[in-house]
Structure formats: C-alpha cells, structure tokens
C-alpha cells in the first residue's frame, strides 16, 4: 500500500524574522557608565537569585504510576469515553482509579489487554496507547476492528462503564534524547501507534533534535489514523518532520502516493545506508514485514533483515521491528 512514485513534502511554514537595530553607539564616554553597569549587574544578580530561589522552591510532582511491571498483576480499567474515528476505527478512553496517576509507560513501550470470552481461552493482545505518557487520569487506545480479530471485535463492542484488564508496561525500543540523528518510520494501518508515540516524545523535548521521516500506508484516505496529530507535528516542525501518505485505493483528487511499496520509493525518501547514526522502524501487518524487512521470530528476536531494506543495503543494526 505504498506508492510507486516519489511523494511530495508538505510545504514548510513561512518563518518570521525579528529585525534588530544596527545603529552604532555614540562616540562620547560617560562617567556614569560604571555606575550603570554596577546597578545593572546588581539587578541581574537579584533577578537570578529570585529565579533560582523560586525554581528551588517549585515542587516536583512525582505522580503515582498505574503500571509498574514486574510482579504486578492485571489492572482493571473502566471505559469512560468512545469516539468514532472512521467506519472501522474507534478511540477508547480508559480512566484510572486515581485521577492524579499516570500510566507509567516509557517510550517506546506497550500494554497487554485481556478479556475472557464466554467460551474458550482468554484473549491477550498488545496495544500502544496514543495518549501522552505524562497524561494523568486516563489512557487512550486507537483500535481498528479486523474481521476475525477477537480482541478488536471485543473492544469495538464495549460500552461506556464496561471494564478491561491491562498489564505492563511491555518495553520495546528504549529512547534517549538524540539517540539517533535521523529516524525513519515505515508504518501500515494501526502500526502507526508506536511510531506516533516515538515521534511525539521527540518533538515535545526541546533538547531532542532528531530528524524524523514517516512513510505511512493505508487502504483508503479515511483509514489514515492520527492524521490530525501527524499534520500538527509536520506544521510545527517542518524542517525536521516529513510525512508521506500512501494509499492503495486513493480518491480521484489524491495527490499523494498510490499503490504498493517499491525499492524506488524507499530509495527516494529514506537516508542512504551509508549515512551515520540512522535508524529505521517498521510496524504494520505481516505482509508489510515480509516485504519491507522480514518478520520477527518472536517478541524478543528481531530475526534476520530481508526484504527491500536489505536489498537497498541497510544492515540489521539499522532496523528495528516493532
């Protein structure tokens, strides 16, 4: 579901520039200059003292964490809100018992969900919340329903005030500020959720200058999840975040990519394998893994790198499969 042709970047926002005075200082000297300088430095010292004192007195909020991992069992959460995002996708909000608590997740990590059907064994599936890790009081899941997908069908059938069991966090790829100079996110369908978690963390941290390129494939335009949030990131950080949207069944007026992924597309939009300090993340349906990077052997075994990324010359250490 990726294009066979290069895609266009969104146009960078126009930037305003502040004009500073270039007027030369007066030639004459003043005997009051040392006094003004002393007073200025004294004022600066008082200001710095007040600022440092206020900063020191500002309490650091250490919020309780809902999910602590380890020996912690399943945590029961109540569904408080339901939002229909498309014909087959919902945003589900689950509230914490403690309104001041945060999830306890780190970037990048996920949660396990569990429910027990009337007959058969419990169904357990991982999901990556799309709400901020520091958000107190609740977490949000974006869930697309799949035919014969027992967990997604169950989640779509839930009503407000019903409850679901969660467990975690399940660590994935631990992110640190400026861990890589440039990362590339290749996502399909709901595979965007861990990608968005990672991108959001990068761009909310003013010290993180990582560049991000996203290739996001879907069947139709209405299947593009988190489009508003992704466009906001691109509009806010046009020099560091570039997004490519590719549709298998595009509308007539669609100006983005069409069709399926090709080697030519990836060669056009991704940094070259020889570039230093890059990382490519892949997340999507099984067919995407097979074509792009090869599948994982298990949750803890990334498996060998095959597919188009291997053909383009990338090595195993440059690719991570969610």
Curated annotation (Swiss-Prot):
InterPro entries (UniProt xref): CBR-like, Cbr1-like_FAD-bd_dom, FAD-bd_FR_type, Flavoprot_Pyr_Nucl_cyt_Rdtase, FNR_nucleotide-bd, OxRdtase_FAD/NAD-bd, Riboflavin_synthase-like_b-brl
Pfam families in UniProt: FAD_binding_6 (PF00970), NAD_binding_1 (PF00175)
Alphabetically ordered keywords of this record: FAD, Flavoprotein, Membrane, Mitochondrion, Mitochondrion outer membrane, NAD, Oxidoreductase, Transmembrane, Transmembrane helix
Topology in membrane: Single-pass membrane protein
Top-level taxonomic group: Eukaryota
Residue span, FAD-binding FR-type domain: 72-176
EC number assigned by the record: 1.6.2.2
Biological process (GO), any one: ergosterol biosynthetic process
Major site of localization recorded for this protein: mitochondrion
Annotated TM spans: 32-48
Catalytic activity, as annotated: 2 Fe(III)-[cytochrome b5] + NADH = 2 Fe(II)-[cytochrome b5] + NAD(+) + H(+)
Single GO molecular function: cytochrome-b5 reductase activity, acting on NAD(P)H
GO CC terms of this entry: mitochondrial outer membrane
Keyword Nucleotide-binding belongs to the record: no
Cofactor(s) named in the record: FAD
Glycosyltransferase keyword on record: no
Subcellular compartments: Mitochondrion outer membrane
Binding site for FAD: 179-214
Stated family: Belongs to the flavoprotein pyridine nucleotide cytochrome reductase family.
Protein's job: May mediate the reduction of outer membrane cytochrome b5.
Annotated protein name in UniProt: NADH-cytochrome b5 reductase 2
Upper classification of the organism: Eukaryota, Fungi, Dikarya, Ascomycota, Pezizomycotina
